[in-house]
Regions:
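Short, well-ordered beta-strand segments enriched in hydrophobic/aromatic residues
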Residues: 166, 186-196
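Short helix/strand-capping turn motifs
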Residues: 101, 115-137, 141-151, 197-254, ...
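Short, ordered, surface-exposed loop/turn motifs in non-cytosolic proteins
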Residues: 37, 45-64, 159, 204
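Structured interaction patches on ligand/partner-binding surfaces of diverse proteins
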Residues: 16-22, 67-71, 96-121, 164
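Short Pro-Gly-centered beta-turn/loop motif in secreted/extracellular proteins
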Residues: 72-90
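Conserved small/polar residues in nucleotide/adenosyl-binding loops
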Residues: 428-435
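Bacterial Sec-dependent N-terminal signal peptides
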Residues: 2-26, 31
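Short, acidic Ser/Thr/Gly-rich low-complexity loop/linker segments typical of extracellular
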Residues: 60-76
Length: 435
């Protein structure tokens, strides 16, 4: 289904007849493609209370940055990663008259800044110790890839050869006295939802969780589910470090999810993209062949940290583990998303190294990439991008810069202009619903 989210649809018909084979855009060597930025927030309160901070005034689950944060008159300092267009954060707290929201203004011209927030006087204390026991950090977004690396995609640069939604939640104990009995709750919960596949070649998608040493992982759990709307799901398979399914509701559908801890950082891989759609209309990208509301194939990964109160765990080790998990959210550069094609090529985003198992990068790249900048050619062209909001993906054969008309100027201005380009779509395929 073709949808418009702009009043101006003149000349947009889903074809590229007027396009040439020339480079769609030219990016500078130093452009980092960042769609998010870091802010430091200090939070204090006249009395002990629990708050949550969001990146949008609707305070939806998708815009949650940190939840159930216990604050008091002693200032709590946070490092948060927010969408780059964000001008205001929103602090939600409980008051005597119910839930309230307080805006926190930001400086949009600064990548790294410090802002202070003081919870209003009408806040109330948490109702139980359990309510104040754990905080969690949250990060979500959409990853989109082209499968033509090391060649540019030309007139087919629609960034929809693989599209998946990602969601990461890190839980940590914020009351030391709860750690001995409740420390097993600390860790990472991550979901990867396969939204669309518009390419013939992709077979797998994955992510390297950079900086998370395997010594900080005590237990792993894998689930494969079908994720519907309003929180509905159908469990298909479970396991510890691997889960596999070969049939879904009577239809052939191979899917295997693994957690690989053989390298320096854990690697999560979902294999099974080959069974999605066909080689004519593909999967959820071609107008007229998009099934609205179709449940998405989901990989759910849970990594449980070592209980930091266990005997033999030093304070330095405890702090290092806490930082390693938290930084998966607050330093999103540690999220190394990628896809794998039928000939075993790995395609990552700009600047990210391939995994330890892909040893043919130098040969396969054919000398077309920038020196010392993996997966970025000498025109600045890239094959993957992630956006920290739930944007739609482009329809098949619609140039990404046509679907998102502010995108090209954002790239060619080194990110100085149109920071909110991903909020302004012209032609796209509607995404499946998510919570």
């Amino acid at each position: 289904m073709i949808s418009s989210c702009s009043d101006n649809v003149e000349g947009v018909n889903g074809s590229n007849e007027n396009q040439t084979g020339s480079t769609e855009y030219t990016a500078s060597v130093g452009f980092d493609w960042a769609t998010s930025r870091n802010v430091s927030v200090s939070v204090s309160s006249p009395k002990t209370t629990v708050v949550s901070i969001y990146s949008d005034k609707d305070c939806s689950e998708a815009t949650l940055l940190v939840g159930d944060l216990l604050v008091s008159s002693t200032t709590t300092f946070l490092e948060l990663n927010i969408p780059i267009h964000c001008e205001t954060l929103y602090l939600k707290y409980n008051s005597v008259s119910g839930k309230k929201t307080m805006p926190i203004a930001l400086n949009t011209n600064t990548r790294n800044e410090v802002v202070a927030a003081i919870v209003p006087e009408d806040c109330v204390q948490p109702t139980s110790e359990e309510d104040a026991g754990f905080r969690f950090y949250h990060n979500t977004g959409v990853a989109m890839f082209e499968d033509t690396w090391p060649n540019e995609s030309g007139n087919d640069n629609d960034m929809n050869d693989v599209v998946f939604e990602y969601d990461l939640k890190v839980t940590e104990c914020q009351k030391e006295d709860l750690l001995p009995a409740q420390g097993y709750k600390e860790g990472l919960l991550m979901t990867l939802d396969v939204r669309a596949k518009g390419g013939r070649y992709p077979t797998k998608l994955g992510v390297v969780l950079g900086g998370l040493d395997k010594k900080y992982i005590k237990e792993t759990t894998v689930r494969i589910v079908l994720k519907g709307g309003q929180g509905t799901e159908q469990e298909l398979a479970t396991g510890t470090d691997m889960a596999e399914v070969r049939e879904v509701n009577g239809q052939v559908q191979y899917c295997k999810v693994t957690i690989d801890t053989k390298g320096d950082s854990p690697i999560v891989i979902l294999d099974g993209l080959s069974d999605l759609g066909d080689n004519t209309n593909f999967f959820q990208v071609t107008p007229g062949y998009v099934e609205e509301g179709r449940p998405m194939l989901r990989a759910e990964i849970k990594l449980t940290g070592v209980n930091r109160s266990d005997a033999g765990v030093t304070k330095a080790e405890s702090d290092a583990q806490l930082a390693a998990y938290r930084e998966l959210i607050t330093d999103t550069k540690k999220q190394n998303f990628f896809i794998v094609t039928h000939d075993n090529k790995e395609i990552h985003m700009k600047g990210y190294k391939p995994t330890y198992s892909y040893t043919n990068y130098d040969t396969d790249s054919k000398g077309l990439m920038m020196d010392n900048v993996p997966y970025c050619n000498k025109n600045g062209f890239v094959w993957g991008i992630k956006v920290p909001v739930g944007i739609a993906h482009a329809s098949e054969k619609v140039l990404f810069s046509t679907a998102y008309p502010k995108f090209k100027e954002w790239v060619e201005s080194d990110g100085a202009k149109n920071k909110d380009w991903y909020l302004h779509c012209l032609l796209y395929t509607s995404p499946s619903p998510r919570d």
